[in-house]
């Protein structure tokens, strides 16, 4: 256990160093994948919520590999959780003449005007991982079943305890975060012994979740379980609890089943997580891009199923990689 904890802290230090590196290097990535470009090629642009999340890197690898294989052009922009920067980057891509926009909104309510402009220019719009407020603006929306992710974790949580004082770590600017939290809360409906004592906004980021939970601890908030909208938040929560010698007293539950969180599940430092499948989302997105470009009928809404990972089945999924 001690060696595993040392590895955990080393990984956390690296993770936070990477996060700070992104913050102080201009907040965004500019990538242009143009090798092997064919004549009369299509131009695909992508803007995810942040590239400070391995989930989006894996999803993007599936998409960019397909675009490169087709001989088309692909550009990536990273808004680094800045909604205004995301709008500016989409405007830049429209000026460059993209044919398809793949977007994960930083703020699900903020993109309506720029997406209307994109549609007016004939750009096909694919929304991934979380919804936009006006879903009529998207040609296709591809997400995990986020509500069910919260629901299955909530049901498992109830199997572990019927009385709890809960903190919920949120990201209110995203529909996916809202849906996961709502699914979890709905699973607890009617359980009088379960009390939500605080909701903490953490933007789904380790480096925000850790100090904000620390603030709640310092304020004397009494809690014995934490539900996190994603596992970047879960890792930050585990770090704060470990720092305060509280990890053996507090249960932690999340969504993602990232490699880090699966390692913590295996060590019984996280109770359970609903697994997302970024490779599947990426492949669905890549197929939808070319379906739209070829004029084929495509699905308006695609939900990628999630699965519950617990200490009992974590080895089936592997802890060294995303599923």
Q: What kind of feature is each model-predicted range?
A:
Residues 48, 63, 151-194, 198-199, ...:
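An alpha-beta-alpha
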Residues 8-13, 21-33, 187-188, 277-323:
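Hinge/cleft segment of the Venus flytrap/periplasmic-binding protein
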Residues 103-118, 184, 198, 203-262:
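Hydrophobic alpha-helical
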């Amino acid at each position: 256990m001690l060696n595993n904890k040392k590895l955990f802290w080393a990984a956390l230090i690296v993770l936070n160093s990477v996060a700070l590196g992104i913050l102080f290097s201009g907040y965004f990535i500019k990538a242009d994948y143009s090798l092997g470009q064919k004549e009369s090629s299509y131009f695909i642009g992508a803007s995810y919520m942040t590239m400070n999340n391995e989930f989006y890197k894996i999803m993007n690898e599936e998409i960019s590999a397909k675009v490169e294989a087709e001989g088309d052009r692909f550009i990536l922009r990273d808004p680094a959780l800045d909604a205004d920067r995301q709008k500016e980057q989409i405007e830049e891509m429209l000026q460059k003449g993209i044919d398809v926009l793949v977007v994960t909104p930083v703020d699900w309510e903020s993109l309506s005007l720029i997406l209307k402009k994109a549609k007016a220019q004939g750009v096909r719009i694919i929304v991934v991982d979380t919804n936009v407020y006006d879903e009529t603006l998207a040609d296709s929306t591809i997400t995990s079943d986020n509500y069910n992710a919260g629901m299955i974790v909530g049901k498992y949580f109830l199997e572990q305890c019927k009385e709890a004082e809960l903190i919920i770590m949120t990201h209110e600017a995203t529909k996916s975060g809202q849906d996961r939290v709502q699914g979890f809360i709905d699973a607890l409906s009617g359980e009088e012994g379960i009390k939500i004592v605080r909701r903490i906004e953490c933007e789904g980021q380790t480096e925000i979740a850790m100090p904000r939970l620390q603030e709640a601890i310092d304020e004397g908030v009494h809690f014995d379980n934490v539900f996190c909208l994603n596992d970047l938040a879960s890792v930050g929560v585990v770090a704060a609890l470990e720092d305060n010698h509280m990890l053996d007293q507090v249960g932690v539950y999340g969504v993602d089943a990232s490699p880090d969180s699966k390692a913590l599940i295996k060590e019984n430092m996280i109770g359970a997580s609903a697994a997302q499948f970024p490779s599947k989302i990426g492949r669905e997105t890549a197929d939808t891009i070319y379906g739209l470009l070829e004029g084929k009928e495509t699905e308006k809404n695609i939900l990628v199923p999630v699965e519950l990972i617990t200490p009992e089945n974590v080895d089936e999924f592997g802890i060294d990689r995303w599923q």
